[in-house]
A protein has these predicted regions:
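Extended, acidic-biased charged interface segments
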Residues: 105-118, 122, 145
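Acidic, metal-coordinating catalytic segment for phosphate/diphosphate chemistry
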Residues: 22-67, 81
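Active-site-adjacent beta-strand/loop module that shapes the phosphate/pyrophosphate-binding cleft
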Residues: 34-38, 132-153
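Conserved hydrophobic/aromatic beta-strand scaffold that supports enzyme active sites
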Residues: 29-31, 72, 142-144
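Conserved Nudix-box catalytic region and its N-terminal flanking loop in Nudix hydrolases
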Residues: 49-52, 61, 69-110, 152-161
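Acidic pyrophosphate-coordinating catalytic loop
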Residues: 20-25, 41, 83, 129-140
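A short coil-to-beta-strand element that immediately follows conserved catalytic motifs
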Residues: 15, 119-126
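Alpha-helical and coiled-coil interaction segments, frequently adjacent to or embedded
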Residues: 2-13, 23-26
Length: 165
């Protein structure tokens, strides 16, 4: 049996003309002027793109295998509000930013305590993915965390981070 599939080489070359930090507030944003190789071997013209430098995030889906329950958190998200979403309090996985010197595993165990009041008993990696690669550097390490969900609930979050979860 023959295939009509034509193998196409994935482009690899990117040329940076400039990288300018345009915001260093709550979020760091860079404006890049780049060109990149195309599938046909030619280069794109210079493209101007803004990118939010977010870094790495650890996220966990707390799961109680005995009770067959997943734990999600709910919190206000300004992006949903700014987009006009009718209910900007969103259901989410437990997650947090991986700071220098931390691992994603350490982050999700800490955040599970802070955001949901639960202890992760065992972690299983699920995937690593970019959340919004068209405009953000955020790389998410997603885990399933075995927990005992007995008695969980309530309001959580750190006062110092203005969390209301």
């Amino acid at each position: 049996m023959t295939s009509n599939y034509q193998e196409i080489k994935t482009p690899k070359a990117v040329t940076t003309e400039s990288d300018k930090k345009i915001s260093d507030g709550y979020l760091e944003i860079h404006r890049y002027r780049i060109s990149h190789e195309k599938y046909d071997g030619n280069q794109t013209p210079i493209l101007c793109r803004e990118v939010m430098d977010r870094g790495s995030v650890g996220a966990v889906i707390p799961f109680d295998p005995i009770r067959q329950e997943l734990i999600l958190i709910e919190q206000f998200r300004i992006g949903a509000w700014a987009a006009g979403w009718p209910q900007p309090w969103l259901l989410e996985c437990v997650a947090g930013i991986v700071e220098e010197g931390e691992t994603a595993e350490e982050v999700v165990c800490r955040e599970a305590q802070e955001e949901a009041g639960c202890e992760i008993l065992q972690l299983e990696p699920i995937a690593k993915y970019f959340s919004t690669p068209g405009a953000c550097t955020e790389l998410v390490s997603l885990f399933c965390g075995r927990i005992d969900s007995t008695g969980l609930g309530g309001i959580h979050g750190l006062e110092t981070e203005h969390e209301d979860i």
